[in-house]
């Protein structure tokens, strides 16, 4: 950290342009107003595709970085408005159409529902009996559990929150308009990274966490403590009563009687009745202890508020981001991070790529924590919700990581300047990209052949009736010894590395079985040969996804095959006529291929999770403590062959969706069929060339001309890239809908 003389650096200040862009509904009402060519209107059907492709591609509309920055900033507010409207709708459904109050009174016997279908032509069958005399569609978003943890005790509070969401949405829409049309920040404001870091760290993350910790302590915890003790929701004081009448809090948490005295006398241990370090799960609800999560958010708040004072703005003290980056040199890394500051303040694609990679990874980590450490009350015994939350967060994370590859490649094509990056880390990566990609390719081949080979071996041995020669827990063992060691370490943590904790962070590592209402909430997950094998399939598919995305970024500007890629742009079908064998080399095509492998990777991950949990975790607990799992522990012996995966997982568990006709789950049956249809439809776009369709169209146009009904707008076949885009979109949509129907019909049947 350096203390700088005040005259050396420009002062950070808020600088705006007043009324830079007029508000014109007349202009906005004209399709394609953002692009001179598109604004002329359609001559061919390609126009509508280009309209969609370029509407949000601000780089194609202007080369002025300041204007692009303002458009992105304004779009962020628009996005937040959409999020608030969406959230408001969720809360409104909870208030108006749900059985939340009934569920709250009996959460272990009544299932959550927030949608009742109108019986127009017999759809009333979808309204299943969820208990307590309520008929509706069972929901698996986990919102009821979140609401209970937040301290909602009746539908009126949900209504109020829904209205609050709409107010916030209106505010965001206004802000988006205001900061583009009335007071638009100058470029230097967007590039003032130190102020941004301080604001985001201390303000958004620090004070945001502090506010949430405050809500948890003053509202959530007292209400949940009373609910856990069996007090009826209508008899629980309202949230503001706990805040205005400290005596009500002191009855539940005695330290409240002492007020702030222990805080200012540094006698903080007094507060350990509501800021705890227990570990494990609350045995009543199967969720994390709210006093642990409040403590966690308070600690996070302290850390981030401190972190938000690290960067130098107008007071001559603190870090400069540019200095940190330029000082970051290793013995073998040349100029190190020199030049990266300029990249990250002038290329929003580079910035976005890094943020997407980090946020995508974080989202996947969230997926793992949602079941290992279920944060909300009663969430852990709703198996359909647990499966839905895991799948949802895995897929979202996957899309974000592919997005990182996409924007990394766009940065390389549009924003990278080789002359400004000489011998820094980025330049050095690009210069030894062949070594990186060829090694990664070798790793993929090694993992692919070996992991798949283990399955092929097992299928063959089982077919030949030689179980003693198979890789399994009962024959040739391949135990995941490192994973077991990590589990053991975490199980021993209470009393060793975390001496004040009462239980391990997650019972997935080891410890006891937590049962709520006779169902397993969480228990130790034993790992064996079957897990070892499928984990190497995960390693294989993840490395292939990384290979495709990384190759797309590193070869986005040039390759031996197409040296002038940078001139061709981010997306192009082939290197022009007369150069065969140069298709699918653009940055866009790598994203296109990366999406398939991302989907491939995550399908195996969610299948593994679904079967493993049903086999070895989820189930019923009898009074003597013995556990009966949903699929009776068949994972260890069935998941070691390909045939086992096909027969005992896909086929056996598809019974619920295939046989759903005539039941409340029948919507999943039709979605299962529709998903397969959409998937098959995608292959029509992926497996046929543009010429086929152009020929067909010209024949159809000829017929129209014969009948004098020729269209004014000339029909054109989709371009090669457009066809691929439509293909991959339907491939993923069809696959996701099929998996959704398969998982939900299955998990709602066992729930």
Curated annotation (Swiss-Prot):
- Give a GO molecular function annotation for the protein: electron transfer activity
Q: What does the entry list as the binding residues for chlorophyll a?
A: 684, 692
Which species does this protein come from?
Synechocystis sp. (strain ATCC 27184 / PCC 6803 / Kazusa)
| SUPFAM superfamilies membership | Photosystem I subunits PsaA/PsaB
Keyword Electron transport included in the entry's annotation: yes
- Name listed for the protein in its UniProt record: Photosystem I P700 chlorophyll a apoprotein A1
Upper lineage is: Bacteria, Bacillati, Cyanobacteriota, Cyanophyceae, Synechococcales
User: Which HAMAP family does the UniProt record give?
Assistant: PSI_PsaA
The entry's function note states: PsaA and PsaB bind P700, the primary electron donor of photosystem I (PSI), as well as the electron acceptors A0, A1 and FX. PSI is a plastocyanin/cytochrome c6-ferredoxin oxidoreductase, converting photonic excitation into a charge separation, which transfers an electron from the donor P700 chlorophyll pair to the spectroscopically characterized acceptors A0, A1, FX, FA and FB in turn. Oxidized P700 is reduced on the lumenal side of the thylakoid membrane by plastocyanin or cytochrome c6.
């Amino acid at each position: 950290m350096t203390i700088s003389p005040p005259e050396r650096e420009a002062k950070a200040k808020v600088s705006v342009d007043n009324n830079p862009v007029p508000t014109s509904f007349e202009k906005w009402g004209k399709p394609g107003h953002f692009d001179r060519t598109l604004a002329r209107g359609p001559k061919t059907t390609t126009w509508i595709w280009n309209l969609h492709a370029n509407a949000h591609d601000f780089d194609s509309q202007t080369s002025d970085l300041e204007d692009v920055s303002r458009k992105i900033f304004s779009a962020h507010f628009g996005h937040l408005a959409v999020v608030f409207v969406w959230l408001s709708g969720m809360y409104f459904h909870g208030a108006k159409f749900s059985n939340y109050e009934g569920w709250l009174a009996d959460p272990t016997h009544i299932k959550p529902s927030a949608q009742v279908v109108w019986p127009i032509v017999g759809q009333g069958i979808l309204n299943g009996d969820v208990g307590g005399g309520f008929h509706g569609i069972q929901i698996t978003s986990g919102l009821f559990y979140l609401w209970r943890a937040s301290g909602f005790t009746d539908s009126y509070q949900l209504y109020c929150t829904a209205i609050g969401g709409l107010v916030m949405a209106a505010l965001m829409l206004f802000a988006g308009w205001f900061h583009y049309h009335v007071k638009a920040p100058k470029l230097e404001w967007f590039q003032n990274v130190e102020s941004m870091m301080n604001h985001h760290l201390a303000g958004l993350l620090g004070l945001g966490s502090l506010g949430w910790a405050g809500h948890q302590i003053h509202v959530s915890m007292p209400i949940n403590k009373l609910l856990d003790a069996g007090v009826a929701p209508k008899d629980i004081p309202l949230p503001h009563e706990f805040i205005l009448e400290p005596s009500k809090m002191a009855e539940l948490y005695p330290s409240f009687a002492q007020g702030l005295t222990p805080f200012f006398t540094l006698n903080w241990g007094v507060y350990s009745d509501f800021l705890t370090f227990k570990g494990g799960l609350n045995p009543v609800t199967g969720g994390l202890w709210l006093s642990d999560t409040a403590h966690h958010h308070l600690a996070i708040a302290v850390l981030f508020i401190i972190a938000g004072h690290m960067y130098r703005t107008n007071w001559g003290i603190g870090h400069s981001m540019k200095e940190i980056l330029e000082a970051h040199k290793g013995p073998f890394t040349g100029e190190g991070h020199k030049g990266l500051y300029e990249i990250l303040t002038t290329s929003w694609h580079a910035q976005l790529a890094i943020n997407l990679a980090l946020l995508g990874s974080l989202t996947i980590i969230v997926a793992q924590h949602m079941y290992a450490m279920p944060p909300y009350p009663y969430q852990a015994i709703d198996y359909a919700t647990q499966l839905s939350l895991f799948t949802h967060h895995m897929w979202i994370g996957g899309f974000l990581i592919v997005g990182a590859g996409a924007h990394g490649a766009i940065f390389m094509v549009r924003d990278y300047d080789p002359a400004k990056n000489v011998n820094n880390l980025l330049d050095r990566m690009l210069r030894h990209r062949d070594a990186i990609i060829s090694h990664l390719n070798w790793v993929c081949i090694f993992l692919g052949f070996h992991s798949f080979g283990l399955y092929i071996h097992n299928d063959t041995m089982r077919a030949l009736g030689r179980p003693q020669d198979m890789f399994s827990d009962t024959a040739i063992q391949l135990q995941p010894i490192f994973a077991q060691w990590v589990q053991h370490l975490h199980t021993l943590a209470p009393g060793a590395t975390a001496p004040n904790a009462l239980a391990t962070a997650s019972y997935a590592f080891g410890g006891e079985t937590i049962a709520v209402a006779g169902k397993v909430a969480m228990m130790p997950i034993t790992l064996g040969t079957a897990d070892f094998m499928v984990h190497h399939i995960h390693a294989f598919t993840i490395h292939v996804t990384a290979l495709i995305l990384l190759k797309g970024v590193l070869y986005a500007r040039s390759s031996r095959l197409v040296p002038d890629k940078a001139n061709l742009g981010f997306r192009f079908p082939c290197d022009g006529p007369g150069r065969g064998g140069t298709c699918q080399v653009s940055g866009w095509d790598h994203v296109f291929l990366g999406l398939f492998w991302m989907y491939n990777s995550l399908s195996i991950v969610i299948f593994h999770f679904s079967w493993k949990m049903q086999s070895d975790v989820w189930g019923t607990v009898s009074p003597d403590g013995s556990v009966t799992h949903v699929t009776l522990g068949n994972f260890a012996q069935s998941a070691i062959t390909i045939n086992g995966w096909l027969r005992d997982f896909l086929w056996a568990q598809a019974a619920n969706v295939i046989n759903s006709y005539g039941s409340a789950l029948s919507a999943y049956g039709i979605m299962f069929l529709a998903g397969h249809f959409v998937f098959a439809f995608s292959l029509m776009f992926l497996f046929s060339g543009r010429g086929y369709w152009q020929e067909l169209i010209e024949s159809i146009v000829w017929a129209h001309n014969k009948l004098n009904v020729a269209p004014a707008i000339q029909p054109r076949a989709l371009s090669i890239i457009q066809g691929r885009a439509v293909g991959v979109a339907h491939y993923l949509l069809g696959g996701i809908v099929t998996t959704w129907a398969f998982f939900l019909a299955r998990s709602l049947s066992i729930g």
